[in-house]
């Protein structure tokens, strides 16, 4: 998956993991049980023909992906296109609502965008094998934090670049949990994708594109990292070792 990488600068038990449950896009809150709500992995698979249409692509649950060379690192395991797009203006802010996230799962929050065909994202997929990979992906934001927080309905925001061309976009958003990343595999990737119809904007076609899989390597310092290792300073103080967020530079207009 090649992505426009705009890195947002903010940066145990399966029950302790999380996923994006809902969002506020274009001023609309995509709330529970509305037809355009985000995919619900513990409800949608059991609804048969009554399953609501979604703006986000399917995910298997709240567990992680650990293989950076797997197709699952694109939008999560078994992901398929969603039928709807959320309208949003270029330059506007999108707020994503995560489910419960444990404080112990510290790591970067990263957002990418990929331009879909002019007909939309609803029938477009990055592919089911490593080649071709998802094209035209750029990182739009990233920040280092402890994740959304340890509270219910935690929020993470990103801004749609104001200069990109209007059209349909697939947004890949993830948290990389580093609590077990001292050896590979160990880092836990929690990707999810939703679909936008971007209005306004400019005429910029970002060129700093990457692919998923392909953007991350197991040897990247941001993938294999000991979050608990400390470095001694000249003042006999111990500080956490520096962390480098994996992937390309953040795109700016």
Curated annotation (Swiss-Prot):
Reaction catalyzed: [(1->4)-beta-D-glucosyl]n+m + reduced acceptor + O2 = 4-dehydro-beta-D-glucosyl-[(1->4)-beta-D-glucosyl]n-1 + [(1->4)-beta-D-glucosyl]m + acceptor + H2O
Sequence positions that bind Cu(2+): 17, 105, 190
Annotated signal sequence range: 1-16
Biotech exploitation of the protein: Lignocellulose is the most abundant polymeric composite on Earth and is a recalcitrant but promising renewable substrate for industrial biotechnology applications. Together with cellobiose dehydrogenases (CDHs) an enzymatic system capable of oxidative cellulose cleavage is formed, which increases the efficiency of cellulases and put LPMOs at focus of biofuel research.
Subcellular location: Secreted
Example GO biological process: cellulose catabolic process
Residues where O2 binds: 179, 188
Pfam families, alphabetized: AA9 (PF03443)
Cysteine disulfide partners in this protein: 75-193, 163-253
EC supergroup of this enzyme: oxidoreductase
Enzyme Commission number(s): 1.14.99.56
The keyword Signal belongs to this UniProt entry's keyword annotation: yes
Cofactor note: Binds 1 copper ion per subunit.
CDD domains the record matches: LPMO_AA9
The UniProt record lists the keyword Mitochondrion: no
Glycosylation sites: 22, 143
Cofactor or coenzyme needed: Cu(2+)
GO molecular function: metal ion binding; monooxygenase activity
Keywords: Carbohydrate metabolism, Cellulose degradation, Copper, Disulfide bond, Glycoprotein, Metal-binding, Monooxygenase, Oxidoreductase, Polysaccharide degradation, Secreted, Signal
Chief place where the protein resides: secreted
Source organism superkingdom: Eukaryota
Function in brief: Lytic polysaccharide monooxygenase (LPMO) that depolymerizes crystalline and amorphous polysaccharides via the oxidation of scissile alpha- or beta-(1-4)-glycosidic bonds, yielding C1 or C4 oxidation products. Catalysis by LPMOs requires the reduction of the active-site copper from Cu(II) to Cu(I) by a reducing agent and H(2)O(2) or O(2) as a cosubstrate.
Family, as annotated: Belongs to the polysaccharide monooxygenase AA9 family.
Stated name of the protein: AA9 family lytic polysaccharide monooxygenase F
Organism ancestry: Eukaryota, Fungi, Dikarya, Ascomycota, Pezizomycotina
